[in-house]
Structures are given as structure tokens and as C-alpha cells.
Amino acid sequence: MATHAEEIVLVNTNILNVNMSNVTKLTSTNYLMWSRQVHALFDGYELAGFLDGSTPMPPATIGTDAVPRVNPDYTRWRRQDKLIYSAILGAISMSVQPAVSRATTAAQIWETLRKIYANPSYGHVTQLRFITRFDQLALLGKPMDHDEQVERVLENLPDDYKPVIDQIAAKDTPPSLTEIHERLINRESKLLALNSAEVVPITANVVTHRNTNTNRNQNNRGDNRNYNNNNNRSNSWQPSSSGSRSDNRQPKPYLGRCQICSVQGHSAKRCPQLHQFQSTTNQQQSTSPFTPWQPRANLAVNSPYNANNWLLDSGATHHITSDFNNLSFHQPYTGGDDVMIADGSTIPITHTGSASLPTSSRSLDLNKVLYVPNIHKNLISVYRLCNTNRVSVEFFPASFQVKDLNTGVPLLQGKTKDELYEWPIASSQAVSMFASPCSKATHSSWHSRLGHPSLAILNSVISNHSLPVLNPSHKLLSCSDCFINKSHKVPFSNSTITSSKPLEYIYSDVWSSPILSIDNYRYYVIFVDHFTRYTWLYPLKQKSQVKDTFIIFKSLVENRFQTRIGTLYSDNGGEFVVLRDYLSQHGISHFTSPPHTPEHNGLSERKHRHIVEMGLTLLSHASVPKTYWPYAFSVAVYLINRLPTPLLQLQSPFQKLFGQPPNYEKLKVFGCACYPWLRPYNRHKLEDKSKQCAFMGYSLTQSAYLCLHIPTGRLYTSRHVQFDERCFPFSTTNFGVSTSQEQRSDSAPNWPSHTTLPTTPLVLPAPPCLGPHLDTSPRPPSSPSPLCTTQVSSSNLPSSSISSPSSSEPTAPSHNGPQPTAQPHQTQNSNSNSPILNNPNPNSPSPNSPNQNSPLPQSPISSPHIPTPSTSISEPNSPSSSSTSTPPLPPVLPAPPIIQVNAQAPVNTHSMATRAKDGIRKPNQKYSYATSLAANSEPRTAIQAMKDDRWRQAMGSEINAQIGNHTWDLVPPPPPSVTIVGCRWIFTKKFNSDGSLNRYKARLVAKGYNQRPGLDYAETFSPVIKSTSIRIVLGVAVDRSWPIRQLDVNNAFLQGTLTDEVYMSQPPGFVDKDRPDYVCRLRKAIYGLKQAPRAWYVELRTYLLTVGFVNSISDTSLFVLQRGRSIIYMLVYVDDILITGNDTVLLKHTLDALSQRFSVKEHEDLHYFLGIEAKRVPQGLHLSQRRYTLDLLARTNMLTAKPVATPMATSPKLTLHSGTKLPDPTEYRGIVGSLQYLAFTRPDLSYAVNRLSQYMHMPTDDHWNALKRVLRYLAGTPDHGIFLKKGNTLSLHAYSDADWAGDTDDYVSTNGYIVYLGHHPISWSSKKQKGVVRSSTEAEYRSVANTSSELQWICSLLTELGIQLSHPPVIYCDNVGATYLCANPVFHSRMKHIALDYHFIRNQVQSGALRVVHVSTHDQLADTLTKPLSRVAFQNFSRKIGVIKVPPSCGGVLRI
């Protein structure tokens, strides 16, 4: 007879991978179309049965033998179903995928979607009914406003949908009908789930149910039966029907023992002692009817109780224990069920947990064990034992046997005891079954040892590894350190990338620390293996070290695991971009996340969060200063690699990678007190054999611990260490501020700096016997070996534990990279040339002086102590000078020396906890960039600046440049009639595009506002390139793949020679002591002078013309060099220069010539120019002002403002006198001015800026609110900009539009245009016309005239650039009348007042230099430059204009 498994045959025996790339993604509105498309596709592959269930799942096993065989049809069915499951998920949008998160098969997904979207539910009917009505009104010419549509939909909803109504009403702008429909569907699904939910409590230990109307045999033991995880016998109890059953058979006599009175011959239900429970039972059944799902168990006999005795129960569905110590992992029971015993009474369940049973070869796990205090036997559910551990149990009359289900090898054999099957436990195993024989620790101690993991992970480790726990009945107390340091946002969804072996996918990212570490580390880079989740961490001092670090990492892991790295996944940071050539040469794929989208690299981001949270918790728990974060983070990664994770089925990454469990017994609490054996380091026999140190981590190249001696800063690596995990040395030490360069303070700490971290990865273990290890531990001066084989006695420290790291766990392999040398650090000598930097007591010893016998290097930076500044500035002495020439002022030292800490320096000893004691600063707010944070830290005067050696060095560099350029001569003061211009210092911190600090800059500027025109200066001019010229040249360079170099001329204004006689006072802080009344007669221009920009331009222009450049007529700041077919473009914006060209040799020659003539700082490529971030990708160049936008938002406290979709609201319209006048318009004017500069890369802001600029003379609160809306729009789009696409066609066209009488104050029209060179937006404008016009045609006509003027100028510029257009420019206008006027020679009296515009355009059109073409209003891109638009229209036009967030990642086309 054929079995059921043989009857089910798959229709298609081939495994097919369905291509669903052409299937439209499922949304909440297109289910019917989507389902037909998907069903037809799978029907074509003959796989539709997997969707509708007609192809059922075959049985997992087949055969009638004792050991079943795997069913090949089941394996084939499961593989095909998973492929279909994945394909369907890929065809579902992200908003719909949560609805099918519980489905495990393709058929379940299909049925779930059908129930949600195919039923004629209230949400679907409501949507269709209202959308149909709205469409009918629109067809009748009476369209309903969107706000009214939303109101009509919401007012017809029942009370069950009130939460949705409240959420929509709380929004500033009403959502779309599609979004409302999605919310109604979600709410409807929740209501259906609440109405149809069935509560099914757990079942446990089904043994008996007392019922006088049944003859069921209650003895479930003693038969010779086989049980394994494949039997189909139901273990659930089925209640008997009410009433008596008719059974004519003679009942057999009962041969077992009663479970109540222990007398043989009758069962428990016929026991005489049972009658005393009858009344109680009947009363309980009448008030609380019995449910078949209630947990039940046998009533234990009154035999001697042994908590370690376990009985096998073939009818039980849950394990039960009455001894809490049997549970290694436990948690309170939250269900509402009790265990019912044979007499009908119930026993409460208080906890659930896990346990394990030992066998000859492996332990068997008992999961979901119920802790019932009042039961007297421990019961093992045979069903759960077999299914959990993949074993089978064979019962015999006097014994039983447990076998491995896969191999059939016997694991354990037991005998019956008192006619019960009792699990055999030897006396020596009775204690070790559930607890370790070593010393026990509390849950809190294990929580600290393991790096403060979550409660689930902690319990999993304790359970699976049988760790010794003291007082297991106590719950884990709340950990304040975890609450403080592990607060986080809601996680993102998991990635769909799968891997099948180690190193197939390596995820990497760089983390930046706001605090410079004690070893001068600012960053760390991680490499995470996707398959095992194993993590490697390398500390970095600069991001540029990532490439070399990856090369070392690649060699290390590929050699260790004998496999190659397949794919590196990272972000688009410059530190990873430079790896592309190396990766391609070695056959490694490089996947990158889209710019500013860290969620796509979620594995690395989550790993960062895990590492940082655990590291900060370790620091906080041990009161360790945050400057030690590399040590804490390395320990955190060390522990993370050894902690089980649900992603690996509660395996640890270490075990997944190396195939063996980690050793947890060597773990100690980070930062606790430790006492290493230091006898080999002593100079004489009377020195202490040990010192109190702080435990800082685990050695990865040796089987040893890292111990930091805080007073001396020495880091010992020792195997023989005693630990006191209750004491933390850092918590009892008073610290000053951090010794990092970024956090110096006037108060000096009383503790020295420490050793640097090794350059090896901090978390790389590997199995032993891989070759010789490099020893980096400190070694004694005379001893040949730092380790001693004699065990240290711990008798004198009863409260401490002596520990030695186990050698059973793999250690790190040797590292081929550089290792730290064991040489003492040589302290820098202080220079006494500067009076400010002199040590007040140079002969006194410094407490930071390194120990000459120290085997470890000291920190290269000692703690600075800056003396208290005086009220006057100490001036450097000037050397003697001749009468004809003034010698240069003495420069400030370029590298200020390190000042040693005075031994008697005051130390903060008060008890108040401050951030300064921990060496930290207040955390930055969201998007808080360095410029906004450092705005108040920039000195205002020279007196303030001279207190800081960094500003003092910057001032010295500026003075050196002035002296080297011979900018002035020191002369006696001129007659009183001659103006003496003052001067002052301007201090600025220069930042990179990512907000990181670049350098400190001090600029000496003249007070040019004191100059008088005609006397002190004649003409002024500043070389400023037009923004349109910049965009045109960059577009041409990108299209032709030319290199673009960025130059910065150092002290550019100092290059210009003055023709006027100008006198300036001596620089503050650098006054000649011998001639303090002298003044500086300027020879060269200096910043701040009215004529300085013009003098610099004349100097630069003269030089460029001599070397062959031609000055452009259209833009005087543009220079063109052409030699044969080679051409070079140079754009000048004051002292910033862009240069590009088609000949790299000529380009390099030009750059070298400029560097020889001027002091030029050259950048490798364009990246940050005039506050514009330029990101070049293979598809083109993206220009944005992200950092400038964020700085503006930070300055106005709008970083956390709620974003809006449009910069201006469509209603109400702004008027001149609406609202209340602002008392102080300064801030309003400043923000509008900033927005004007921001419009350089944001044409979507042009109209808003133009509109708000009209009220700068008298702004009101209405205008201020409109300005704040623009800032809110920027808060949601800080990284938007224009994209110059490669492969562009150089055709010129423009869109022109006008808003006729749009200003209700004076009824003047607003015209706007946007000009394109191919797909590149190169010029745009939004401004009011000069006067009132009488028709829309006239307004549009004047706008076309203005646009044609701009096109004519652009054509002239293109001609000078050597670019010839193949077709005349085209202007697109949406006004038919204006288009006809341009094309037809018509003129009459009504057009007299626009005759000039008419003749100008007519000549352009008739000569063929211009064409005017009509375009539909829906395609008029300039519409967004003349009036506020709705959200949908604005976003549509912004996208068409070319304002995007990031450049296309895979060659996407920018559609216009």
C-alpha cells in the first residue's frame, strides 16, 4: 500500500528561479492587477500550485523503518517554495511587506494578501466610493479642493477609525488620499485581528484528567513502545463528551500502582482517598470549567524527594521541575494557566526556563521547562526531548535507551525505578548537571563580565554553557549603566543579502570619535564578516589609513582561512573610494551605499551602535575616562564576538567562525582592580611583587591580560594576575581633563599619559600553532622571560579571585604589520625663544617624565599647562635695523614646544562630578557641525588668541608671510593730515566639507572703512567669477571627462603692489618695543584695504596675459589658454581658482608655473569650493551646499524643525503690510542674505528668496513665519543640489514664464527663466518686472525678452570658450500670444510701450539666432520660479529642473 509521501508528486521536478523584474511592485491600491500578473507568470512556469495550495508540502520523511529517510520530494518542494517566496517578496513594496512578515511559505503570503486586499472591506469600499465621486465632480468642472476631499472622507468614518482621524488632523498639511487609504487598511487589519484572535495557552505535561465517565487507562508508562520526533501521535488531551458512553466490553483489571495512595490494584480515579476531593472538585468545575488546553501533570507520590530525579513522561507536552536550581536560564511566567493534577486541583506556574541533561557524548537541552514549586517530581516530556535534540527514545519493560536520530548511536541507557522510567544521574554528576563546580557569581557579576549584554543573551550564555550562578532565583537588577548608554532609536529592517561561507561579504565602516584618545586615536575601522558576524577592529589616527589597514586585514584573514574576500560593502567615503583600483586588481567586488543613506550599510551601523554602547557602558561602569575608549571598544568587540546572537541561532560569531565554543571562564570585569605578578621588573628584592592596576583588556597575541598601572601609565601584559572585581581604581582617582590635543585646559591633570595601542587589530583571534608570535608584552630588563611557571598564591586575598587565561581558546596569529617598539619616549625639549612658552621652572622635574627603564613607549603628547595670561601681551624683541629698511618682526615659532606639568599644579579636588573630570565635552546636537560649535571658541582679540598656542602659531604664520612678502616698512609717523589706517586680527577655524577641522587661520586685516575715497584710494574692483560661468565650465569639463583642479592662493592680496601711499599701525601683539610709535608704510596690498582686490587682480591678470592666457570679454574673471588643440580654462573668484583643460601635460605645466610665481596650495581634485561641495562620480558631478545649509540651520536653531515639502505656501499670499512689524529686522535680513547665496545650487529656492527679499526694509511676523518655512524646507532637503550629468549634448534652451500681476501690493508681474546647456541647468532667475503691464501676453513677452538677453550673453561666453552650438537656442513659452508676437512681424498701437523689447526679440528671431516655441503649462519648468506651487507640482518640477538629493548611483538618467 502506498504511503502518503508516495502519493504526493511534484508536477515540475526542476527547480525554477522565476524572474519577476518586470512585475509591478504591489502597493495598497493595485492588488487586482498585481495578482493577475503574478498568477499568470507562475502559471506559465507551472508553479501556480505553490500559490493557491494545490501543490501541498510533502512529508519531511518517508519509509517504515525504525530510522526514517529524508523525503527528496520534500527537499525539492521546500527549495522551490523558498525561491517563489523570495521572488514574491521582491515584488512587494516596503510599505506592504510588514503585512506578510509572519508568513513562512509562498501560499501563506498569497492567502494573506488576498484576505487583506481582495475582500470588499470597509476601507476598500470607502476609497472607491469617494474617489469615484471626486472624479465625477472634476469631470463636471467642479473639482473639489484637496482639503475638502480629506474632510469628506474622514467625517464618514465610524468611531473605530478615530485613531486614524486624530493622526491625520494633527498634521500641518493633509496627506494624499492614497496615504489615507493605506492608513485605513492598516487600521482595518488591526480591528480584524482583534476580533478574530484566539488565545491558545501553552500545554504542559498532559497525564490525566479526572473524569468519572471515562474508562481511559491512566498508566502511560511500562509499554514497549518507540518514540521519536517523527511520530504522529497527538500529545494533546481530547475531552470526553458529556454523558456516559455505551461500552459492552468487560473492563480489564488495573495492574498498576495508584498515584494517590501508592497501593497496587486500582487507579487514581478509583482511589478511596479521592472522595475527599470530590466536593471541592465539583465546586471548582461548576465555577471554573475545565479547558482542554490547561497544563496538567501527575500527582506525585509520597516517596523520598530528590530534586535531581527526573522521570520520563511520554504523554507530557512540557517539562516540569520543582527545584529552581535545576534551571540555568529562567524568567517569570506571564501566562494565566496552571498545572492540573490527577485529582482535578491546580498548581500555579511561577517561572519558565531551560536545563540540560548529560550523556556520554553530549548534553541534551530541555527548553520551556515549567517551574511548579508544589509538585514533587521532575517530569521530562519525551516529545519535546526528541524534537529539541533530534533523538529517539526506546522503552523496554525494565529499561529505556536514548539514541541519536541521525546516526543511531546510543547516547544513554537507563533502568526503571519504582516502575517508573527515571533518568540516570550519577552521584558525581548530581551537582554538575545544572551548575558548575567552580565558584558561583551573581547574575549582575556575569552581566558585567560579559560586557553588559541584554537579558536574553545573558540567560542564553548561562543556560547553554552551564555557568555557575549564585542565587538563581534572584532576577537581574536594573543596570543604570545600560540605561544611560544604550538608549537608541527604532531599528531598521534587516538586509536581504545572504552568504554561504566566511569572507564572502565583508562590511566595513569608519567611526569617528569626538574625543581624542589617550593614544591619539580619532577613528576606528571595523570589518564585519556577514556569514559569521565576526568583527575585526583597527584604531586609526587618520581616515587615510583605511587603505593600508584593509590591505593588512586582507592578507591576514585570507591566509588564515584559506579563502578570498568576495565583496567589500562600505559607504561612499573617500577613504573607501581610493580602494577601488586595488579591489578591482584583486577581483574583489565593491558595493557602496547611496550617499547620506547609512541605512543601506545597516550591518556596520548596527555594529557601531553595539560596540559604542557596550564600550561606553564598560567605561561608565568602571568610571574610566572616555579618553580610554580604544581599550573599552576593543574589549567590547572581544566580547561581542563571543556572545551568542539570534542571527546565528544563538551561536556566537567566534563559534561560527572557528567551530569551537569560546572560553568564558577567563572573562573579568573591565576596569576592575587587578594585581599582576611584577617581580621580574623589580630593581631590588625589597620592592613590591605587585601593584594595583586596572584591567584594560585581553592580549590577542598572548594568553595574558592587559593591566594598566595608573600612577606611572605603564601597561603590563601578564598571565599571573589576581582580580578584585568589586574595586575599580579609576573611580577613586581624581582626574583632570584629557591630555588630547583637542581638549587642553588651564588645569593640569595629576596623572601621566599612557602607552599607545598596537597597530595590530584589536580583535583578531585564531586557532593556535600558526607560527611564531610577536611578543609585545613588557619584559624585565634582565630576565630572559617575563613569565614564571610558579602559581601565585591567593591566600592573602580572600575576596579576590586569582585567574590565568585559559590556553584552550584560540589566540591571535602573528601580524606582519609594524609593531610598537619597546623604547622609552624621548620628551621634546622646550624652546625658550618665546617668552610666552617659557617653563616657569625649567629645572624642576616633571611628574610626567618617563621612566628610563620603562619597556613601553610613553604618549607623545604630555599634559600641557598653560600659564595664566597677563593683561598685556608680551611683544617679541625686534633685532637691530638700518635706517633705510625696516627688518622683519620676529616670527612666532611654527611648532610650539610641549610644556611639562608642574608638580605643584592645582588639581580639581571638589566632589562635584563634572565633564571636565572625565575629559569630555558636551555631546553635539543633531547635525551640530564644528563651525556652529566653535563659533564662541574663536578669539575676538589678539589678547585672547595669544593665550592659545594654536592661534599663536597661526598669527606667527601670518606675520611670517607678511615679512617674507615685504608688505611694509617700519617708518616714523606721517604728518597729522595723513590718515593712518588701523588693523586688527580676524581668527577663523577652517573646516572640511564633512565638518572636520582643517586648520586654524589668523588674518591681519586693515580697517579699510577709515579710508577716504579720492585721497586714500581711487578705484575698487574684486575679481568675482559669475555663477553661470562656473556652472558652464564645470558642465563642459564633466561632459568631456577633464580633470578639475582647485587652487588656493596663500595671502593673495599681499601679491598686489600699491600705487597709493597708505600708512597702517603696527599689528596688535607684534609692536616693536624699541619703536612703538612707528607705523607701517604699506608696499603691498593687505586684506581690508579698499584697493586690495583690484591690486591682486591686476597682478594676476598681468602674469596670465604674459604666459598666453586670454581674458574673457563676457566675464573678466575667466581666462582661456589655447595652444593648438589644447585648451585650458581658469576661473578666478578673488583668491580661489578653478582650472581645467583637455591636456593634462599642459595643465600640469600651468599649475607648476603658478606655484613658482605665487604661493599656491593645490588640491588634487575639486571637492569644496566657495562653500559648495562637489562630488564627482562616474556619472557626473553633484553640486550642493549641504554644510552651508546645516550651518545656517544650526545658527537659526532650526536643525530639529519639522520639515515641509515646499518652501512657500500657496495661501495666504504675502503682502507688504500683513502682520506686525518686527522690532529688529537684522536677523531676518541676515538669513535672507544667506539664502541668496544658497540659491547658487538651489533653483528651487529662487522664487522664495526673491519674494522674501522684497520685505527686507520692513519685515513683519508674517514674513518671518514665511522665512521659517523656507528653513523648514531646507531641514528636510539639506543635501539637495544640481547634478551635471556626463554624456551631455551641448544644446542651449531655456524656459521662460511670468506671473501676471501676482504681487497684490503693486500688481507688478514676476518673471522667471531657467537656462539649460543640454541637461545641465546653468542659469536661472526670478525677479519682478519694472512696471505694471496690462495683459498676461505682455508680461510673458517681457519675460521672453529678458531670457533672450541672458541667452545672448551665454552664447558669447560659449564662443570665447571655443564651443560652437549646432542649433540656435530655443526659448519655451507657455503663452500663445507671446509666442506669436515673437514669430510674426505684427505691430500696432497697443504695443508702442514695448517696442524696444519687440524689436530686440524680432531681430533675434528673424536672424535665426533664436527660436521661441510654445510649450504646455504642465511642462513649463520656469513655473516654479514665478509663484508658489502645491506639493505635488513643486516636487515634480524640482525633479525635472534637476534638483536631486544624490547623483544617480548606477548610471541613472536625469529626466528633464
Curated annotation (Swiss-Prot):
Keywords: Aspartyl protease, DNA integration, DNA recombination, Endonuclease, Hydrolase, Magnesium, Metal-binding, Nuclease, Protease, Transferase, Zinc, Zinc-finger
Compositional bias per record (Low complexity), positions renumbered to this chain: 210-245, 276-291, 793-814, 828-841, 849-886
Domain Integrase catalytic: 498-661
Gene3D superfamilies, alphabetized: Ribonuclease H-like superfamily/Ribonuclease H
Pfam family, one: Pol_BBD
Zn finger limits (CCHC-type): 257-273
Residue stretches making up the Reverse transcriptase Ty1/copia-type domain: 965-1208
Active site: 313 (for protease activity)
GO biological process: DNA integration; DNA recombination; proteolysis
Annotated segments matching region Disordered: 205-252, 276-295, 738-896
Residue spans of biased composition, Pro residues class: 887-896
GO terms of molecular function: aspartic-type endopeptidase activity; endonuclease activity; nucleic acid binding; RNA-directed DNA polymerase activity; zinc ion binding
Polar residues biased stretches: 738-754, 816-827
Name of this protein: Retrovirus-related Pol polyprotein from transposon RE2
UniProt gene name: RE2
